[in-house]
Each structure stands twice: as C-alpha cells, then as structure tokens.
C-alpha cells in the first residue's frame, strides 16, 4: 500500500498488521491511494478500483477491496465470523453476531493470560483453523471495559463511522503480546449472545443447536 498524501498515509495504519506468520506468499498486489479534487482514488495494480472517497471512508473501502481479493485467492477455506484464542494449548472459537462484544472479550482475554489470535474472522480447512490477520476493531464506547489499553489507545490508528464514533485498529503486538497466526485444530466453540450489563453465564450447548 502506498499513497501521495500524508493524511491518507496515517489512515493506512488502520489496515497494516504485523502478526507473525509463516505461510508461503501466493500472490502480491500493489494498492495505491491518490488524493484528487473529488476525493480519494484507489488503484489496484495500476487500475482504478474506486474513486470519490473521503478521508474517513477510504480506509474501510480499501480494506474491503483487499480482503475481497484475499478471499477469492483462498476460496477453498470456509470463513467463520469468530474470534480465536488459546488457553493452555487448547484452541477455541468465540462465535457471535456483530455487536455482541466479541472484540471486547477477545481483547480482554489478552490481559487474562490467553493467547489471542483474532477478533473477527477465522478460516477453516481440513479440520484446522487459521485466524485471519486483521487488527482488532475496538469501538470507542467499549473502552471503559478495557482499562488496560486506555494509556496508549490515543496513539492507535482509527476511523470514524457515519455517526462520528471512533473505531480503533488495535494490534496485540503493539501492546507487547506475541501475535501469532498458525493453523491448529479447535477444541471448543463458544457461541456468544448479547447480554450487555447482565451477568455472564456459561451453558453447555449441543452442536446441532449452535449451528
């Protein structure tokens, strides 16, 4: 990713991640962002992808284009909307709808001794899972639940949604954790339901009902 605009360059930090991974590179692409009179232009390998974007939205759109192409290349994988972590060597997934608190939970688990690999997306193939290396998208209104990151959160890349609320792109490695992406089998699956402000309860659930 490259750009001719210093403001856009700062926004690219929202996308760039630094997770350790040892998978072969199957393809390389060059994305460019140029500032124009009518907004920002995104190019992929020299060809236009999208134009007329403002500074607040282009990072989201660029990430959408990048991830879309990645999913085409690794089409043999099944995507699961899930966080991924390990405890004492046992890998588990945290599945749930958008807004239930997966990212907040996965970030908090980092500070509770868990190895956390992703907050949003996991790829599955041949019985093994590969966490998708994307920065954790922490909503500004959940920061009161994550006091550990408050001292440095203002230095973390962020974008603003349509309502002006900030969404921070958090990297575990920037907080001193080992952010590692590797394929492993899953031992447990947790399905998270919204219960904001209520008591946390863990219940056993048969696989067919969870599906």
Task: Annotate each PLM feature.
Residues 39, 80-84:
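Short, acidic/polar N-cap/turn motifs at the starts of alpha helices
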Residues 58-79:
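N-terminal pre-Walker A segment at the start of P-loop NTPase domains
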Residues 105-106:
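Post-Walker A alpha-helix
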Residues 1-60, 73:
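Long, basic/Gly/Ser/Thr-rich N-terminal segments
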Residues 102:
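Conserved lysine of the Walker
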Residues 2-12, 83-96, 111-211:
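Glycine-rich, often acidic-flanked micro-motifs
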Residues 14-17, 64-68, 111:
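Short, intrinsically disordered, mixed-charge
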């Amino acid at each position: 990713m490259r750009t001719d605009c210093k403001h856009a360059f700062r926004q690219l930090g929202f996308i760039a991640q630094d997770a350790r991974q040892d998978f072969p590179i199957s393809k390389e692409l060059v994305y460019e962002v140029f500032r124009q009179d009518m907004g920002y232009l995104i190019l992929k390998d020299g060809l236009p992808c999208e134009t007329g974007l403002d500074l607040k939205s282009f990072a989201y759109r660029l990430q959408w284009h990048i991830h879309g192409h990645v999913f085409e290349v690794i089409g043999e994988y099944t995507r699961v909307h899930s966080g991924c972590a390990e405890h004492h060597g046992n890998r588990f997934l945290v599945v749930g709808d958008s807004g239930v608190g997966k990212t907040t939970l996965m970030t908090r688990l980092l500070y509770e001794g868990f190895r956390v690999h992703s907050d949003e997306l996991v790829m599955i193939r041949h019985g093994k899972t590969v966490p998708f290396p994307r920065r954790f998208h922490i909503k500004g209104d959940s920061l009161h639940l994550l006091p550990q990151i408050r001292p440095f959160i203002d230095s973390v890349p962020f974008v603003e949604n349509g309502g002006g609320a900030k969404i921070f792109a958090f990297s575990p490695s920037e907080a001193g954790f080992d952010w590692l992406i590797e394929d492993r089998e899953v031992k447990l699956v947790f399905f998270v339901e919204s219960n904001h402000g209520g008591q946390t309860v863990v219940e056993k659930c048969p696989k067919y009902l969870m599906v």
